[in-house]
C-alpha cells in the first residue's frame, strides 16, 4: 500500500491506499487460511453437532486465487493494520532498526506499522514496547 501526504497542514488527512491482497503471497495466505478454517470447522468432530455451513466465500471456490478474490470482497483488518512501514534491511522496508525513515532526515515512525509481520496476539503490547524502545533511541541520539 501507500500513504500520500496531500498537505503540510496536519488537519488534512493523507490519502491511504491499503492494497489488500495485492501480492501473490497475500493471496496465497488468504486462500490457505480459508482452507484451514474449512477443515477445522466443517470437517472436525468438535463442530459436528452445530451443523456448520459455509456462507462466504462459498464452497464452490476451491483454489487459493478464487478464495482470495472472494475474501477481498468482504474481509477487513478489524482495525489492526501493521507492517505498512515495515522495519528491516530488505528493499521493501521503510524504516531502519532505529525506526528512522530511510532517505528522510529527522523522521521516525513509532507505531505498529513498523512490525515486519503481525504478532500472533493483540498488537497493543508490542506497540507499547516499540514506543518504549523509540524513547530510548531518541534520548540516546540527543546525548
Residue positions per predicted region:
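FAD-dependent oxidoreductase catalytic-site/capping-region signature
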Residues: 1-126, 134-143
